[in-house]
Amino acid sequence: MSNKGLIVITGASSGIGGATAQAFSKAGHPLLLLARRLDRLEALKLPNTICEKVDVTNRDEIKSAITKAEQKFGPVDCLVNNAGVMLLGLADTQDPKEWEQMVQVNIMGVLNGIHVVLAGMKERRHGTIINVSSVAGRKTYSNHAVYCGTKSAVHAFTEQIREEAASYDVRFTTIAPGVVDTELLSHTTSKQIVDDYQEWKKTMGQPLQSEDVANSILFAYQQPQRICIREIVLCPTRQDK
């Protein structure tokens, strides 16, 4: 068994989640990787790693997977809530089912993970929860109304729960990336919105890479437990909004 703490990462099958898994594995941590695409998790081929097919909107699935990992690696030391969806559209034309999906994954998916691990962390008086939000949780963007709303919620409840957990030496960090070169945009169904977004990305030169965000997550975690980095906002230098 590793002498380093267990790291749980949701949405770990690609993008930021996959890069974060690789970063923590390189640092010597045992991992529990959660996602709906089990084959993509297993393709990472990381040592001391348990891969589980989990839907973050199902709290029981998260709890079952974490219980299994803790039996092998010990208690969760850090939870990285990374799973999320971005479905862009205008409020009067977007399918409300897409709103519901974003609310369930981006808000409830994060809260479900917190609910499963927080009590144990408070009891042990040690632990870190890192929630991957977005710069869209701090300001609004065209076609992003509900997505911005879900990410604003992540910022709000992360800060409030951080206050509740601070006296137990449990840390909460919000990571708010700008435009990242990932699969996230592929969820959007409007070709025009996707095309416009891609044109906007071109104005930035090079968007963030998943590894850039993963390095920020690892940096926040690796600070001494007495230091809580509450929020990291990182964007391409040429991203003007």
Tell me what each language-model feature is:
Residues 27-42:
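Conserved glycine-rich Rossmann-like NAD(P)H-binding loop of the short-chain dehydrogenase/reductase
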Residues 90-91, 95-100:
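Substrate-binding pocket helix/loop in short-chain dehydrogenase/reductase
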Residues 114, 150:
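Active-site helix of classical SDR
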